[in-house]
C-alpha cells in the first residue's frame, strides 16, 4: 500500500519518529509540497496525508488509486470533502489532540496582555527598573482576571477546556454554543452572540471556519465591544476581518488582541495586524507543543490502521 505524506515537516520537523508509519506500507514523506507538485508526488498513492496542503476535486479526479485522505489536523477545510465523498474516498482528521496546548496558549495571550508581561520584561532590559526610585516599577494598568467575564465562541473540546481554566481564575464564563442550558455546567452561562460581544471583557474564538463564521468578527461587532475588551483568536484566522480589527485597535474601540492565527499564513508584509496597536501575534504555534504533536502522530497511526482494517474512525462527514 503506497502512503504519501505531502507536508510532514510541520507535524514532525525531526524530533519525532516516522518508523511506525513506514511499517504500515510503502511510505514516502515530503517536508513540503507545492501545489504544482501534488499530482506527481501523489500518483499511485492509496493513502495521502496532508496538514495544510490543499486537495481539490481536480486533484482527486486525477488520482484514481486514492482511497484515503488523512488530515493531520483537526480542521479539514483544506480538503474538498464533498468531492471525496462522491468518489468514495475516506477523509479523516485528528480531533482533540491539541486541546490542552491551545487552551494554554489562550491564557498565555490573556496573561501577557492583562499583566503586560512582554512589555515590562522589555522595559527592565532597557534599565527602567534599575532607574526606579521604588522597589517596583510599572507604568501600564495591570488587570486582575477574577470577576471578569470571559466570552467563549464555540464550546467544543478547546472552548470547554478554556472555560475550566477561566473558572479556576475566578472568571465568569459565558458561551455562545449550540449546546442547550441542560448540557452546560452551572458555571457557564449561555448567551446569544451579540450579547456576548457587548457584555464580555475578554472574548476567545473557538468555532469552526465555515461560510457562516467567516469574518464574523468585524467592524459591526467591534463597535458592540467594551473599549477595555480583549479579543483572543487561536481558532482560524478568517474568523476575524483583519483590517477591521486593526482599525478597532488603532482607534481605541477595543483595548487589545492576542492572535495565533491569521487569514494568510505566513502573513504578507502588509498585513495590517503586524503594526496594529496592542496586537500580540504568535506564529500559529498553539497546537505545536511536543506532547500535542506526539498525540497527533499516534492518532494518525490509529486512523490508518482502522482504515486498513475496514473500520475507519474519525471520519469527516
PLM region descriptions:
Residues 1-45, 308:
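N-terminal glycine-/charge-rich "phosphate-binding" loop or analogous flexible N-terminal tail
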Residues 31, 72-73, 89-100, 177, ...:
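Short beta->alpha connector loops at strand-helix junctions that form conserved
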Residues 45, 63-66, 200:
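An anion/phosphate-binding loop that grips the pyrophosphate of nucleotide cofactors and donors
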Residues 54-61, 179-272:
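Rossmann-like adenosine-cofactor binding region
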Residues 87, 96-149, 316:
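Phosphate-binding beta-alpha-beta segment of Rossmann-like dinucleotide-binding domains, i.e.
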Residues 91, 172, 228-317:
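Rossmann-like dinucleotide-binding domain for NAD(H)/NADP(H)
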Residues 158:
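Hydrophobic/small residue at the entry helix of a nucleotide-binding pocket
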Residues 168-184:
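NAD(P)-binding Rossmann-fold cofactor-contacting core
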Amino acid at each position: 500500500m503506497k502512503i504519501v505524506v505531502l507536508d510532514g515537516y510541520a507535524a514532525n520537523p525531526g524530533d519525532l519518529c516516522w518508523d511506525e508509519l513506514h511499517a504500515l506500507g510503502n511510505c514516502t514523506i515530503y517536508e513540503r509540497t507545492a501545489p504544482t507538485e501534488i499530482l506527481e508526488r501523489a500518483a499511485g498513492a492509496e493513502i495521502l496525508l496532508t496538514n495544510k496542503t490543499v486537495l481539490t476535486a481536480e486533484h482527486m479526479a486525477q488520482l484514481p488509486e486514492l482511497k484515503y485522505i488523512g488530515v493531520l489536523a483537526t480542521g479539514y477545510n483544506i480538503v474538498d470533502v464533498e468531492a471525496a465523498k462522491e468518489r468514495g474516498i475516506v477523509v479523516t482528521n485528528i480531533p482533540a489532540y491539541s486541546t490542552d496546548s491551545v487552551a494554554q496558549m489562550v491564557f498565555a495571550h490573556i496573561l501577557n496582555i492583562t499583566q503586560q508581561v512582554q512589555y515590562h520584561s522589555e522595559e527592565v532590559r532597557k534599565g527602567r527598573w534599575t532607574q526606579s526610585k521604588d522597589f517596583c516599577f510599572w507604568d501600564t494598568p495591570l488587570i486582575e482576571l477574577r470577576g471578569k467575564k470571559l466570552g467563549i465562541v464555540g464550546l467544543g473540546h478547546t472552548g470547554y477546556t478554556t472555560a475550566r481554566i477561566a473558572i479556576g481564575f475566578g472568571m465568569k464564563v459565558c458561551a455562545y454554543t449550540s449546546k442547550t442550558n441542560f448540557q452546560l455546567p452551572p458555571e457557564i452561562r449561555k448567551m446569544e452572540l451579540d450579547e456576548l460581544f457587548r457584555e464580555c471583557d475578554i472574548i476567545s474564538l473557538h468555532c469552526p471556519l465555515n461560510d457562516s463564521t467567516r469574518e464574523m468578527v468585524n467592524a459591526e461587532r467591534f463597535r458592540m465591544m467594551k473599549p477595555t475588551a480583549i479579543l483572543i483568536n487561536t481558532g482560524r484566522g478568517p474568523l476575524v476581518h483583519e483590517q477591521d480589527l486593526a482599525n478597532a485597535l488603532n482607534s481605541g474601540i477595543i483595548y487589545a488582541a492576542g492572535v495565533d492565527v491569521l487569514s494568510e499564513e505566513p502573513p504578507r508584509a502588509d498585513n495590517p495586524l503586524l503594526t496594529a496597536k496592542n496586537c500580540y501575534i504568535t506564529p500559529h504555534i498553539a497546537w505545536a507543543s511536543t506532547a500535542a504533536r506526539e498525540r497527533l502522530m499516534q492518532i494518525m497511526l490509529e486512523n490508518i490502521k482502522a482504515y486498513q482494517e475496514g473500520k475507519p474512525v474519525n471520519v469527516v462527514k
